[in-house]
Amino acid sequence: MTNRIELSGVVAKALVRSQSPSGVKHCHFWLEHRSTMVEADLPRQVFCRLPVVVSGARSEALTQNLVQGSSILVSGFLAYQTSRNGVGKLVLHADKISQI
């Protein structure tokens, strides 16, 4: 099975940093993507807003220069998460971030 995604976009909301009870650092933010893709030989406007999380010791180094409005390229994998209120969503777990 393959689960790998690369998506460019803009940091849509301010970063939120947290730490788990076991001491793992996390950085959460929303990535907003807009592009024009070709589907069935026709141009299609694409828009999505996706939550991103960066975890572990490298989270601060990967996100230290990010602010709301930063244009970035994010690589990682997708995972389904269910919130405390039972609402589920796909989350991009990033392991590489570069500014563009």
UniProtKB/Swiss-Prot annotation:
Residues 1-100 form the SSB domain. It comes from the Bacteria. GO terms for molecular function: enzyme activator activity; single-stranded DNA binding. This is Replication restart protein PriB. Homodimer. Interacts with PriA and DnaT. Component of the replication restart primosome. Primosome assembly occurs via a 'hand-off' mechanism. PriA binds to replication forks, subsequently PriB then DnaT bind; DnaT then displaces ssDNA to generate the helicase loading substrate. Gene3D superfamilies: Nucleic acid-binding proteins. The gene is priB. HAMAP family: PriB (MF_00720). InterPro entries: NA-bd_OB-fold, Primosome_PriB/ssb, Prisomal_replication_PriB. PROSITE patterns: SSB. The keyword DNA-binding applies.
